[in-house]
Amino acid sequence: MRKQLPKDFVIGGATAAYQVEGATKEDGKGRVLWDDFLEKQGRFSPDPAADFYHRYDEDLALAEAYGHQVIRLSIAWSRIFPDGAGAVEPRGVAFYHRLFAACAKHHLIPFVTLHHFDTPERLHAIGDWLSQEMLEDFVEYARFCFEEFPEIKHWITINEPTSMAVQQYTSGTFPPAETGHFDKTFQAEHNQIVAHARIVNLYKSMGLDGEIGIVHALQTPYPYSDSSEDQHAADLQDALENRLYLDGTLAGDYAPKTLALIKEILAANQQPMFKYTDEEMAAIKKAAHQLDFVGVNNYFSKWLRAYHGKSETIHNGDGSKGSSVARLHGIGEEKKPAGIETTDWDWSIYPRGMYDMLMRIHQDYPLVPAIYVTENGIGLKESLPAEVTPNTVIADPKRIDYLKKYLSAVADAIQAGANVKGYFVWSLQDQFSWTNGYSKRYGLFFVDFPTQKRYVKQSAEWLKQVSQTHVIPE
């Protein structure tokens, strides 16, 4: 049976400033935590990325032509405040006004993120999410944006806070590349929730006629077997990556079970509990009651089994299938059951995980009025065919199959009562990846990075049909 999406369900593509704009040294842009980190690695450069800084109109025209109603963008904090605070860079401000005007011209509603993995370098150097000064400057940057860009009606405070907190201090794949510091991870998680809450409360106090939400990376953890030990490992993994954020941002308080699981992880690693104050918890509670929507970024699921050895993370950054390792002392070891399909980067293809996460939010966090799927997609190794013309359409049947399965899971969740209002595919066009460079392509539109020419993929045509008909083809 063909699956239907609601008539008011919106579809679009997602981007992030650092991954698409390029122009990292143009028009007074300040440095961010990635610049030094990537230069020292010498593996790949964020310039020119997809050169969106100069080619945004071309990409927005493609989005419009292929049936999109919405688009996810982010503002690069260091284009507005090169140092994170203090002097404003007017050229950066002017760029975003032009970008948002182009969205209006192309009939695209922008959902704009304030922080998408790109802390200004000075604030990263003093502790990033562990620094109170950073948290204060973040709120002031948000205030500036709310006042400066009244044309934006859909704001997102932070993109995937869990990806930053865990990968900065536990797995070490994001700068400052520390490993095993669960105490720093949980303190960063709490501090992110506090900063988010203060920004939501600020936005609502300003009486602006728009919506504000947050975007979480939510990959569903399952037990590897039906043993109680494996179930507990899945619960601990859930506490590390999901539970604190869901409780804090969507319920306004940390559940006793969440805190007990976190204390267990920290005790196993002989690390102290994170600190929080009554004032912070009051702000968190107030914000949860005012939040307009939550964004769910879901790509894959995880399976956990009990593990009591040393922590070890091996990141598969080049698509060498089967090379990733993830085992954390005090939590568990990731191991996929037989028969689970994966990408070359070892990400499982398991749409049931999307359904279960959407239903979990619907059932366990009734305060939040709306859900958007703010990222979902598949990274593939893709190249241009030999005889390419400007009209070449690139076949990507694996992506179409993936999108069909995951959109069907979204439709099932809506049918079961979840108020999912829209879907953003990651990504609009091929982009620069933080830890994979240019080899992992997610776009609906192929970017030939040496020439910056765009080519349509068949998935763009497929999604256009879904957008126009609100029917997922069989």
From Swiss-Prot:
- Biological process GO annotation list? lactose catabolic process via tagatose-6-phosphate
Pfam families per record:
Glyco_hydro_1
Where does the chain bind D-galactose 6-phosphate?
A: Q19, H116, N159, E160, N297, S433, W434, K440, Y442
| GO molecular function terms listed in the Swiss-Prot or TrEMBL record | 6-phospho-beta-galactosidase activity; beta-glucosidase activity
State the pathway, as annotated in the record: Carbohydrate metabolism; lactose degradation; D-galactose 6-phosphate and beta-D-glucose from lactose 6-phosphate: step 1/1
Keyword tags:
Glycosidase, Hydrolase
- Spell out the disulfide connections: none
Entry EC number(s): 3.2.1.85
Enumerate the InterPro entries for this protein. Answer: 6P-beta-galactosidase, Glyco_hydro_1, Glyco_hydro_1_AS, Glycoside_hydrolase_SF
- Active site location: E160, E375
Q: Which reaction does this chain catalyze? A: a 6-phospho-beta-D-galactoside + H2O = D-galactose 6-phosphate + an alcohol
Q: Which GO terms describe its cellular component?
A: cytosol
Question: What protein family does this chain belong to?
Answer: Belongs to the glycosyl hydrolase 1 family.
| The name this protein goes by in its record | 6-phospho-beta-galactosidase
